[in-house]
């Protein structure tokens, strides 16, 4: 008697053993990566490629980004009424505000991730120590003009009056060293553009409804690290909660990339939970309703686990870390993965033998998997790190699911259920006659298909593209509004629009920065720029220092100092003069300022082409890029940079690149289909292409076509490809239709959740897939009959 072909044999057990062994090894690797370090990150900028700009511009942008991204600003004030409040007017307790600021700062500094690099006492002492030798060769533009225009007598009288004026500029150096307080005026001028003043040694912003006290701390590691967010954010949350419990009234404004990163990470985790868990719940319900057994559910679970473990292991091996958006994107592949399971189980039901089913479905499974994997791996040729990561994750997940179905499929013992029989009757009585009747009207059938192609093509032709980088934003409205309020209070320099100045040497660089400062005068007069910050303000050119030293020596120490001594009844003026005036120092250079962390954003960098530095601008909201570019065009070695526009332009180029790769992927799939099925491949290719176009046309109605819409098209193509291949191999029967229906319903539920995402990227992705899969489910059966025809 010959052995029953449906019984398990040694080959089946060996294949299953080796696959489970490989899966165990991959699981151990994933577990090791999870235990040794944090495998996930949420920095959206790491998914973007480097901008195609000059190296020095990229380096300065990175320098600025690092400085601003590691900064954490908090503004706090008490809104408790003061004890001196009258019935008519409320006075706010500023001492209470200062107490809250001290308490919060001390709590935050208990974190090992925060440092107080801008401690006001240390900062002031550093300034005084650095500038002390150069105090007699540094003049602000206003003071220089004053010395040039006023008489020596007037300068002496002004200096004498300020000695006895308690509100005059602080004197960092002794009167014998700096009788005209040149050093004090220089240091005060460097901080004059700031809205922040020192009150009781604390940075304060004066306001009618109570003073704001500033806490400015710096992160010593990336704000995108989850462990840093989990360490710092709870400190602030607990502080606010405790104040509310104590009945304190206060306002706290938070600004810094760490808050936006934490909001993005929280939202991404929420999206992963809603998409992944929603999809899994849909699969469980559908499997139990259709198969009335836990065994198919176990089969689906094993296939999904295999795909997820393979995707995680391969992605962690290739990239070391996985972005949370990649994980959210990958969770949508659950629908594709279970497609293989549904087709295998339902055809096993029909044939009554898993062994025969595997042999029969092997070509279809192989064609579907290889086509989809090839399409995903083609994206590795893009210079888009996010696309590359998603491609590897998706391809590895599909491969893992395919291997699981092939290796473990023979162990599935099919049992028919009443639900499957009812679905079969429903298909034969309603679905099959409906599609047969539609196909019998050949002209109508062809007209509808051609009409859909024409309508979608016209819609897409008239839809504008959307390349705004702000669509990547994951911060909530409240956080954005808080950041805007802080910007209004502090009026900081813009980190998005600035100048890059290049030169052959440091001396030439400072001179060009000074010339640019002069060239910006028309914009200052038009109130388009309120101030700017550059190295030239902190370290003037050597030529300017020499001129200022000569002016100070001649006008102040030769002419005004004797008159000042006379006014103050100082008899030994010559000895005093000798100790006060020093010889011209070698000159203050940017190298002398390297210990001042406050200058990090404008610090110069060196390259093979020379030296480069940024000039930051405090801009009016009405200032246009054309205003700033017109100034740059008149200067040598000056370039204007708009970081947001650069990133948006980057999305333009990569949307175009993804379009090319998408067309190439479709051409590759078409070649595989024609090689495998000849002209019958058109039956698969036409509904697949039409579904992708419909999904893209529907999604483009809301915000134009983005690069993420195009990425979603690949997933629609993958699911439509599976549906078409199985219809072709097995014929349009109740089993193949039910499998396609289950797969589509699972994916639609998952992607329906995704299309309601608050993350613009995921929302755009979900809309395309939702519309595309629905279209594929409706359209694909039109092209196939009950039996394989070619």
Identify what each model region corresponds to.
Residues 2-42, 408-468:
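Signature of alpha-helical transmembrane segments and their immediate interfacial
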Residues 32-80, 193-202, 462-504, 718, ...:
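Solvent-exposed, non-transmembrane loop/terminal regulatory segments of multi-pass membrane proteins
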Residues 122-294, 535-670:
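Extracytoplasmic
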Residues 296-341, 681-724, 752:
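Hydrophobic transmembrane alpha-helices and their membrane-interface caps
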Residues 302-417:
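Hydrophobic alpha-helical segments
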Residues 351-382, 730-758, 775-777:
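Pore- and gate-forming transmembrane helices of large, multi-pass membrane proteins
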Residues 446-567:
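Juxtamembrane segments of multi-pass membrane proteins
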